[in-house]
Amino acid sequence: SELTISTKLGLSDAPLTYFRLGRGTDISKESYDCPVLYIGTDGSGSFHLNEDDEVKMSENDILYVAPKTLCGMSAGNEDGLAYIEILLEKEINMNSALKAGEVTKLKNLLDYEKGSITNLDLIGQDNLKFMIMAFDEGCYLSEHRAPGEAIVFALEGKGIINYEGTDYEVNEGDNFKFEKNALHSIKAVGRFKMALLL
């Protein structure tokens, strides 16, 4: 469809909005007084920064935009563009791996370690945490409960999420939502990378 749809996500106190731009649609440039993080969830398109900078965005890409930077979006003509917009606090703990105005593939920010799970925190603030994790073959997180709702973004490979006693397979490009205090575990099938928004 050729519509633009935005939906507020109630995952945390931080303002999170899911946007779906239909084929060939756009959002005019605007700026925020706070930093903004964009996470591509589906399709492809462009982000237009300031006067004439253009960066391409697609699934599992991440873009950090500095405060007071003009930013508009346009969807591709084939499949549209979907992304999550996160308005961050002015004072935030942001990992230096993220550079303002650069599109980054999340899965390329973290390497595998033999027999281990590696974790890289990208954003940390009181009401929001965003991290990426790399599970070597056979590694897993034991059953546990999280203090808030969360979304998993499968970045590479395949994993099995056990959620409240039921197994769910997630593959690159898939997302999975956890409710607050839901019992869950995650196991790699082969090597597996994911991002977690909590």
Segments (PLM) and residue ranges:
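A short, N-terminal "cap"/entry segment at the start of jelly-roll beta-barrel domains
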Residues: S1-P15, S58-E59, L63, E78-N127
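Conserved short histidine dyad/triad with adjacent acidic residue
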Residues: E2-T4, P15-Y32, G115-N119, K129-A146
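Short strand-coil-strand connectors
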Residues: S12, N50-E51, N162-T166, V189
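Short, conserved beta-strand element in jelly-roll/cupin
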Residues: R20-L21, S31-S46, M133-D136, R145-I160
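A cytosolic small-molecule/anion-sensing beta-strand core signal
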Residues: T41-D42, S58, L155-E156, N171-E172, ...
